[in-house]
Design a protein with these regions (language model features):
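C-terminal engagement/docking regions of AAA+ P-loop ATPases
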Residues: 1-14, 246-330
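Conserved C-terminal "switch" segment of AAA+ ATPases
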Residues: 12-17, 30, 167, 181-253, ...
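Pre-Walker A (pre-P-loop) alpha-helix and adjacent loop at the N terminus of AAA/AAA+ ATPase modules
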Residues: 13-59
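Conserved alpha-helical scaffold flanking the Walker A/P-loop in AAA+ ATPase domains
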Residues: 40-43, 96-116
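Walker A/P-loop
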Residues: 45-82
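P-loop (Walker A) phosphate-binding loop of NTP-binding proteins
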Residues: 56, 90, 158
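Conserved AAA+/SF3 P-loop NTPase catalytic/coupling segment centered on the Walker-B
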Residues: 88, 109-136, 150, 165-174, ...
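AAA+/SF3 P-loop NTPase mechanochemical coupling elements
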Residues: 104-113, 142-159, 170-179
Length: 330
């Protein structure tokens, strides 16, 4: 790709990504701190991928996606997952009307642009798979009719850390459908003081709608057009391959710590998330730093740890760090 095209593309990205700062400012009006969370929400939104959030209750996970939906002027719904939830409670069902003596379709809360699946690991596998199928297919079948889900469609699922009681861990195949897994941490001291002050004063700012859903659909197309060199493609595939055969990259010590590596879906997600990150940084091309910036979020839920790794308290983040240090940067 010649430099003229890259310059044109860069100018176009500069123009098209001007809303990113406005959207971030709008969200920061409502959410104190959690910059990492806000950034990853934008990456998921622009890369057309769903997000899994892990963190203890009370860290503004619900508030974050609700605020994003308000700023994009889109429909938001929240599904609280509980042990007695049924698939019909998520996707919808047929209701018999005595008046018309016919079955009528009642759509479930999945029919929204932004869906918060709260505490997804509190529900049995049957309900989890109904949601994850809708995420993958972007359509839902009720009775014998199939309905397309609205665009843009973004699911943000939250889960409590597995140590907490009464949880059903998500199977690996289903976790793989989430583009990003973001670990949400506690706010800093100063931020928490500001949160307390805002609550004491009773002043709760609201996000104003600054975008339309169509703007997001257009921005996604621009993100796809962000230029990725073949060297960067090879770099991404090398990182993912190193999770499967670490010994080929001089990381023999990791072989006994990894039970399974990341799937090809990880390579696709890493590529799209890197493009979205470059777009957020107002660049028309991907550089290795973009790939490294999103590596943890894309790979942390796609690498299986052996019992040996768990016994030694090795985390997937440590394994990813070793891989990034070992794989040659283009």
């Amino acid at each position: 790709m010649d430099s003229i095209n890259i310059k044109e593309l860069n100018d176009r990205i500069q123009q098209e990504s001007s809303f990113v700062d406005l959207l971030t400012m709008e969200m920061n009006k409502v959410i104190v701190g959690q910059k990492h969370l806000v950034e990853n929400l934008l990456i998921g939104l622009l890369a057309n991928g769903h997000i899994l959030l892990e963190g203890v209750p009370g860290l503004a996970k619900t508030l974050a996606i609700n605020t994003l939906a308000s700023a994009v002027d889109a429909k938001f719904s929240r599904i609280q997952f509980t042990p007695d939830l049924l698939p019909a409670d998520v996707i919808g069902t047929l209701i018999y009307s005595q008046k018309s003596e016919q079955f009528q379709i009642r759509k479930g809360p999945i029919f929204a642009n932004f869906v918060l699946a709260d505490e997804i690991n509190r529900s049995p596998a049957k309900v989890q798979s109904a949601l994850l199928e809708a995420m993958q297919e972007r359509q839902v079948t009720i009775g014998d009719e199939t309905f397309k889900l609205p665009e843009p469609f973004l699911v943000m699922a939250t889960q409590n850390p597995i140590e907490q009681e009464g949880t059903y861990p998500l199977p690996e195949a289903q976790v793989d459908r989430f583009m990003l897994k973001v670990v949400v941490d506690y706010p800093k001291k100063e931020e928490e003081r500001l949160i307390v002050r805002m609550n004491n004063s009773g002043e709760f700012p609201k996000a104003s709608p600054i975008l339309k859903p169509e703007d997001i659909i257009r921005a996604r197309q621009v993100v796809r057009d962000v230029y990725m060199d073949e060297k960067i493609e090879r770099y991404i595939v090398d990182i993912v391959y190193a999770t499967r055969t670490p010994e080929d990259y001089g990381l023999g010590k990791l072989k006994n710590l990894i039970s399974y590596g990341a799937s090809p879906r990880a390579s696709i997600s890493l590529s799209m998330a890197s493009k979205a990150y470059a777009f957020i940084k107002r660049r028309g091309y991907v550089i290795p730093e973009d790939v490294r910036a999103v590596c943890n979020e894309v790979l942390r839920h796609r690498i299986g740890l052996t019992y040996e790794a768990e016994a030694e308290n090795v985390t997937t983040e440590q394994i990813i760090a070793e891989i990034i240090n070992a794989v040659e940067v283009p």
